[in-house]
Regions:
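N-terminal secretory signal peptides that target proteins for export/translocation
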Residues: 1-12
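Bacterial N-terminal signal peptides
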Residues: 16-30
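Long, hydrophobic N-terminal alpha-helical segment
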Residues: 35-86
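Structural motif
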Residues: 59-62, 77, 103-107, 143, ...
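Short, glycine/acidic-enriched capping/hinge loops at junctions between secondary-structure elements
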Residues: 64, 72-78, 89, 118-119, ...
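Feature captures the catalytic cores and cofactor-binding loops of soluble hydro-lyases/lyases
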Residues: 69-70, 78-104, 124-148
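Long, position-biased, composition-driven segments near the start of the mature protein
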Residues: 108-114, 119, 123
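Glycine-rich, aromatic-bearing surface loops/beta-hairpins
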Residues: 119-202
Length: 202
């Protein structure tokens, strides 16, 4: 006479089978090559919007070319956008313009203006396009050029304490990275100076 299976064991077996099926379904739907902690290129706009809401005074956003180094300071987050650099710059500036709590201070590489077309094909057109984009923000933002290594050092130092978002692009022209330091959008340098002077007089 065949022995009947215990009802608890039968139920437990069914639960395990269901769990296994669910796990296989999740794995099948997961995008190929996805790994934990590595943002996918399609998500860079979402990540930018999420981070911008949290960012403030002394945070940075950098839009960099393909060969920009992966920095190791704990506060630096690098995302591969797999997108056009000028397009990413424009998107970042547009999003910052919509934010009331921050304003951009833009840094570009001082070397860029001296890179010859003969050594970097496309650099002339790039300079013109970037000037056009930054020209639209004239009067609304501060912009200055510094040597590339000096800017990287600024980011490396800031990344020890503050969050920095680096958006890596497909551009293959040197010294084209655009670095955006965020400042308080509702408190300017002149107001800060007056405040410090008032504090010093008391």
């Amino acid at each position: 006479m065949a022995r009947s299976r215990h009802p608890i064991r039968v139920a437990f077996g069914r639960v395990l089978t269901f769990a296994a099926v669910c796990l296989l379904s999740v794995l099948a739907l997961a995008p190929a090559g996805a790994s934990a902690g590595t943002p996918q290129a399609a998500d860079w706009r979402v990540r930018l919007n999420q981070q911008l809401q949290l960012m403030g005074h002394r945070n940075w956003i950098a839009v960099v070319d393909s060969a920009y180094p992966l920095q190791t300071s704990p506060g630096i987050e690098t995302i591969e956008t797999n997108d056009d650099q000028l397009k990413v710059v424009q998107t970042v500036l547009n999003q910052i313009a919509k934010a009331k709590h921050v304003r951009p201070v833009i840094f570009t590489d001082a070397e860029l203006k001296l890179v010859p077309e003969s050594d970097a094909k496309g650099v002339t057109a790039y300079r013109q396009a970037l000037t056009g984009i930054l020209g639209k923000t004239a009067g609304k933002t501060e912009a200055q050029s510094l040597p590339h290594e000096e800017i990287i050092s600024k980011l490396d130092e800031a990344g020890k304490t503050f969050h920095i978002l680096v958006l890596k692009t497909t551009l293959t022209i040197p010294y084209t990275s655009v670095f955006i330091q965020l400042e308080c959008g509702y408190w300017g340098a002149d107001a800060e100076k007056r405040l410090r002077e008032a504090m010093a007089s008391h």
